[in-house]
Amino acid sequence: MQFLPIKSYSNIVEGNALKLNWEEIVPKEKLSYIIGNPPFVGHSIQNEQQKKEIRSIYVDENGKEYNLAGKIDYVAGWYFKAASLISNTNIKVAFVSTNSICQGEQVVGVWQPLYKRFGVNIDFAYQTFKWGSEAKDKAAVHCVIVGFSTNHNNEKKQLFSSTDKLDLVDNINPYLLSGKTIFVESVKTPICPVSPMYFGSKPTDGGYFFLTPEEKQVIVRKEPQSEKYIRKVLGAQEYINNVERYCLWLVGITPSELKSSPMIYERVKKVREFRLASKAESTRKFADRPTEFKQNAQPNKPYLIVPRVSSENRRYVPIGYIDPEVIATDATQIIPNATLYEFGVITSNVHMAWMRTVAGRLKSDYRYSSTIVYNTFPWPKITEEQKEYISKTAQGILDARALESESSLADLYNDVIMPVELRKAHQANDIAVMKAYGMIKKVNGKDKLMSETETISKLFEMYEELTSKK
């Protein structure tokens, strides 16, 4: 665009773009393009004024607020106002935006109203890239560029990858992938008959339940009767990086036992004080039960643990079985009754492809959510023979990990140094799962596994079929 940067004939209007009437500034008949770089403010860090602005904009034809209006990034306001302005015109829009509007639950919150109410169509997109800045205190911001209009045509759409590769495709969906436009909506229970997934236990304790190895040793030395109430604990970081950490697990402790353990008593007292000082009424109420985690989801049998945040540099999110004596915090998701077959499927490249597509992100790291990733995942219809075989390949992954028991999962799943046996075990499991899904195609008369793009297309088809029946 030769008119950038603006040097002359500029008409700059100062004001809040989300409160101004854009047509009063420039009639849409005079517009060909709208381009911009709106403010990057995530939904969780918006101030009250910004939240109010977004909620007042994201409304339907009757002025009713859309369900997810309170859970979308600030930049979405520019998308909505632009879509409203360009409806039934040939005007084209392009914004630099936070990549989170094309990930996880925000895809539904941001894009579904734009498609259904205004009939937008993505013309081109630049997938996630890290924002470059020369500022000394620059923040790590991951962005996308999205160009859209309401002028539907048969022209190929331009899809740029983070490596500057350009693909000409028939359609770009709101996940910024080539393929049919699908909206994966969060649900509280799985859409297929599989074991449910829950948050791990939530302490809401101000940190007073938690102990370093050194703090544990001091308590055990001075108050040996307390040792039975100290458990190993795992959040995502402890699980992935093999960090030793402990917590007080005081289920069943009697008042006399507590009084005879001054060090534990003092921590319980501080938990109570912390909860009483909370602004949340539900937390203040739980001050009357200061020996307990606020939410206890701990299973009494071995369970699968899934870290809620995992590095984008790992091909597989490290998932594994944990002994019930080890406490899982709400920095993880857990599946209490998971079979080996279920472990095999969710640790496969098929599930990982789904996760990479529909999960939200923390910066560029994956945020695994039960409601948007696990519960929406389409499982295959398989035979008992296939299920048994996947169970064997899943066990093969656990066996390969056991050969490197001294290594952390962070090291085992570092793609550069991943042990050969573990890689082979995952590949065998991937093939077994893909065959169960029928993700095989003929190429020159030979069987070949589908690519990740083809895998996602098939999963979207399955998802649409499963959810259309409900």
Task: Show where each model-derived region lies.
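Generic recognition of flexible, low-complexity loop/linker segments
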Residues: M1, L20-I25, K81-S84, W131-A135, ...
